Structure formats: C-alpha cells, structure tokens
Amino acid sequence: MSERPNILWYCTDQQRFDTIGALGNPHVRTPVVDQLVRDGVAFTHTYCQSPICTPSRASFMSGLYPSRVHNTRNGNATFPNWPPVISKLMADAGYDCGLIGKFHLQSSGRRTEPRIDDGFSYWKFSHAPRDDWEEGHDYADWVREQGGDLNALRESDDRVPTELHQTTWASERSIEFIRQPHAGPWMLNVNIYDPHPPFIPPRSYAEQFDPAAMPGPHFRESDMAAQAKLADCDFQDEVRTPEEHDAHAVQARYYAMIAQIDDQFARILQTLDETGQRDNTVIVFTSDHGEALGDHGLMYKGCRFYEGLVRIPLIISWPGRFVADHQSDALVELLDLSATLLDLADVEMPDYFQGASLRSILEGRDLSDAHRNFVRSEYFDALDPHFTGGSGTYATMHRTRTHKLCVYHGKGVGELFDLENDPWEHENLWDDPAHADLKHRL
C-alpha cells in the first residue's frame, strides 16, 4: 500500500449489536451510522472477548485474549509492561496518535488512570461523565470553563444538556485533533461513555423516544427459573421481569443516548470532509461490549454471554478502497480489529497476536464467511469487587456458526444454545441427553 491512511476509531461503551437502523432496528435513529453501513462493511457477527470493560479493552488494544494479557478484571491497579498496546506500535511506526475519553486498562476509581507507554501524543482523558477526579479530567474541566456544575447537572430534571455533554466534548476534542497539523498519518481513538448506564440522556433526546413504542426485551417467563440456576454467577443487577425493570423506559433512554451519539459522530465526519481528509481516512465504529437491556430478566452486564452482551457493532469504511454496502456475516472477534489496523497501516504484526486481519474482506478479495470457525469470550472474576465481593466466578463462551456453549467453571452449570432455531437463547440444551455429544465436542 503506497499511502498509509489516517484512522478514526470511534468506540462507544456498552452498545449492543442490534442498535443500528440500517442493520434492522426500526426503533432507533442512526442516520449517520446508517450511511457508514452503506459506505463500507458492517461485520454483523462481531464478538467482544469479555462482556466487561477493562478485559475487553485490554484485549482489543493488545491483540490478545484477556487471559493471555493477564488483564481480566475491572479495578486493576496496574497494566502489564507487556505486551505493547496498538497505539504504541502505531506511534513507533510514525503515526501521530490521539486518545479522547476513557482508556480503562487500569482502575480509575478515586484516581486519574495512570499513563502507560501508550504512544499517544494527544491525550484528553475522561473516564466517565462525573466530576470525581480533582485533576486530569479534561471533560470536567471543559464543563467548568463554561460555567457548568457537572454533578449538579446530572441530578437535574433536564440532565446534562447536549452542549455540555461528554459526547459533545468528545466531538469538540476530535475536531481539534483533526484540524491540527500532522507531519504524517494519524490515528484518533475516541472512547465515549454512552450508552453506558445510568441511562440519563439529555431531556431533549429522551423526549424523542416513547417508552410505549419500544419493542421491549427478549424475555420469557421461563428465563426467571433459568437465571435462578445461575444465581451464583456474577451479575450487576438482580433478575427481574421487564415490568420490574421498567425495561421499555430504559430501552427508550438507551436509544436516546444512541441518537445523540449519531448526531455528534456526524460532526466529526463533517470535519473530515471540510479538511479534505475523508478519502484518506479509515473510519471505524464499534463498542467495547453490549448491554443486557432486560433480556432474560437481566439489566447491565456481568458473567453471561447472551447475544446482547457479547455481540457488538463493527462498521469499517474507506471510500474508494473498501467495498461498499456489504454486510459480512463472518464470525469476527473484536481483537481482530487491532490486527486489521496494523495491516492497513503497513505496520508489522507481532507474531504473538491472536487477532486475524479483516483486510481481505474489506477489500473484497474474500467475501466468504470463512474468517473464523468460532469466537471466544471470557469472564475471569471480571467485575469490580464493589459489585460482587470478589466471588471468584470464571466462565468461557465458545460460539460457532450454529451453536453457543457457555461453561461456568466450578459451578456445575452451563448453557448450550442452538442459535439457528433459538437465536435469542431461551432453550438451554445443557442438560438435554440428546445434545450431550455436541456439548462435549464443543
């Protein structure tokens, strides 16, 4: 490749795969991301390597499974000295790298996350849209400069208005980075907090989505008994019916947050157009993991591997270089993204990488769905002990084209789903004698 592209890597937090209008959801409002789908490749079966923030981010930043990089839980005090993160590899190869928002490879509880040898020359940190950090929180400083009180706004009836929202701040900083001079190619990693709980969009967006018009979660009454069997496996919230969760209202607020994301993402893409950089910029839209959103009686995240929790959006576009308007059903792991970006940037891929580049699909040289035979996700005591008390829950997911196996190690329980006939995973075949051979083979 004679010309190394810029890379705009936009990562939301806790966004499910089924939240894009162009990919089949008529209830969301995502016209800008919809256009990105038409302009590029949407990988419809992309899976994160952990349903929890830090291990997932450690994985896609390192190209390794969380267990391999030894960074398997939220609340870690440190990040290992090895391996180097992808931004360091890119910077060493001549890229000007910027970080906006959260990094979350280490704990940010009651402290600003310490820098590692990350390769970022532009660093605008905001772990979460709270004013919990006395120094080093660029977003809170930005709100104060405009006369706002972030914590008071969060508790107000109108919530944080769009003009002071963290998603808006991220766009402002992105525009600043894109417009500044760069001696060579750049990579900008934008990590916003939404649509992460507590699900408090600005009122102006919340009013656009009627809870009564929402489809609600994927739930059957039998899910209550199924979750009771998994009660010893970590989760952030109690099992409840959709009515007890007020799930339709939560879904409306969740979609409102995604609508605001779409509007602010548009401003960044417009800046690429205005500066004449769109044609030489690879654009990535993705998330770190999903959200239960009431499915199976669950809200938030934890040690489960249902589609809403581990399957995420991944859309990649490069005008004129990648195929357009293609939806790939290939099984993809999120750590494949780091391998792909190194490949596109002509940066040598370390031999220890566990990710596999998607470049041949993006360029239309291989449009089959044969990228991977299976995908893996892990949960190794991953939730912060604040939520679990350190229960010592360990589990792994093995998902093929047709089936999903979830093993909760040492708990004596598990899940096996026939995804062709039960795509929303309500019929657990784990104890079915007719599927014993399949379970053991998986």
Which residues are covered by each model-predicted region?
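Residues forming the ATP-binding cleft of Hanks-type serine/threonine protein kinase domains
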Residues: 420
